[in-house]
Amino acid sequence: MTETISKTMKAVLFDQHGSPEDLHWRDTDTPRPDKDEVLIRVRAAALNGFDPMMLSGETGLKTPFPMTPCGDFAGEIAALGDGVSDWRIGDRVNPYPILPVKGMMGETTPGAAAEYVCVPASVLIKMPDAVSFEDAAAMPVAYGTALRMIATRGDVQAGEKVLVLGAGGGVGVASIQFAKARGAYVIAAASGAHKLDR
């Protein structure tokens, strides 16, 4: 599959911290993949709780403007940078949004509220055909955060007890799934019974 890639694309950009009124849909240069990077055609992007905090400046982090928001997304590889050999154009991918050296997408490096975005090939996860782009786009930040807590930082083992607060949210649901997959006994708490039904 070969795709003609325009030199310009549409993207959501903001030039200063503020409110949703500071987001603008406009033309910008289409990024080109550097060595060991891929260019992804964004098929679906999702907002998470971090995006409004980034837009408002609540995080206190230095943002290089203009910035494109959104770290949660899924798409198809449109171009390969030099040195990328494990991926093919057209592969359906779901990248982890924290990029080595560059930081969090939509915070310190351009996010995915755009037609195209470049990421290192090392952060790609191949999407199963049965998973929609929309479903996959809702997962990276929540599931990445939960995986880091349960597997990397917590090193949860079979038989251990895990308390998940905020169990009805994205990170909570993902934490429950990862902890159960590791054989832990899970105690879940949420602000209401309707959230525990998730």
Feature map (PLM): residue ranges:
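Short, Lys/Arg- and Gly-enriched loop/turn segments at beta-strand edges
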Residues: P100-T109
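Structured surface patches comprising rigid loops and adjacent beta-strands/short helices at the edges
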Residues: C118-K126
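Mid-domain Rossmann-like dinucleotide-binding core that forms the NAD(H)/NADP(H) cofactor-binding site
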Residues: R92, A136-R198
